[in-house]
A protein has these predicted regions:
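Macrodomain-like recognition of ADP-ribose-binding/processing modules
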Residues: 1-227
Length: 227
């Protein structure tokens, strides 16, 4: 699994501690999917009125005023921990409904299990698409993290690894050939996620080296250089 932690959100913007939002990286390009932390209510009732990261994504997809999601999305996602990849023209969006930890007590082990299921659903969808890259973000972040917010970076890293390890070999291969970026919108949170994913990013570098290709060339849309 080739993954890096990026200091910007899936759309290439970042929020400073002051609350100011600025563009720091190129937006998603064709062949690159982005993850949408969808709310089940909005999947059922339509994207109109969604806020936060999902609202920004729906505006980018030009569906923020639509009354409903496409039928394949509504049919595939009927409960939390489910996912569906959908194309909007040339833009690919991986809708995922994660667990909501804000309204209930949940142990770290229980949270890890639920997050693993959510990331597993997302990775299976992505593996079947054969796309070149995926911009992820922490599922169940923000207000949905509840009392588990301090543990979310380590839970996210552990869940993503467990989800990948549980994939069939063919899906592991497909995911490994793509580039995964864990995108952190809040600048104050980036260091915590970089630390949590340190082992994963080291493994990614070792995996790339094992292919005999050297380091994978880093593109401007990945880092923000040249934006």
């Amino acid at each position: 699994m080739r993954i890096a932690v990026r200091p910007f959100g899936v759309l290439g913007t970042a929020m400073a501690s002051s609350g100011a939002v600025r563009k720091v990286a190129q937006g998603p390009v064709p062949g690159l999917a982005i993850l949408d932390p969808a709310g089940l209510r909005f999947i059922r009732d339509g994207p109109r009125g969604a806020g936060g990261a999902a609202g920004q994504i729906y505006r980018w997809l030009e569906i923020s005023e639509h009354d409903s999601f496409p039928a394949p999305v509504r049919q595939a996602i009927r409960a939390p921990l489910q996912a569906k990849l959908q194309y909007y023209g040339v833009r690919a969006c991986l809708h995922v409904v994660g667990p909501d930890f804000s309204q209930r007590h949940c142990s770290e082990d229980e949270a890890l299990g639920e997050l693993t299921q959510a990331y597993g659903a997302a990775l299976r969808e992505f593996a079947g698409a054969r796309l070149g890259g995926l911009r992820l973000l922490p599922i169940s972040g923000g207000i949905f993290a509840g009392e588990l917010k301090p543990q979310l970076p380590s839970l996210t890293a552990g869940a993503l690894r467990a989800a990948f390890d549980a994939l069939p070999e063919r899906d592991q291969h497909a995911v490994s050939m793509a580039r995964l970026d864990m995108c952190i919108f809040e600048e104050d949170e980036h260091a915590r996620y970089a630390e949590a994913f340190a082992e994963e990013t080291e493994r990614a570098q070792q995996f790339t080296a094992s292919l005999g290709m050297g380091r994978t060339p880093t593109q401007p849309w990945q880092t923000g250089v040249g934006v």
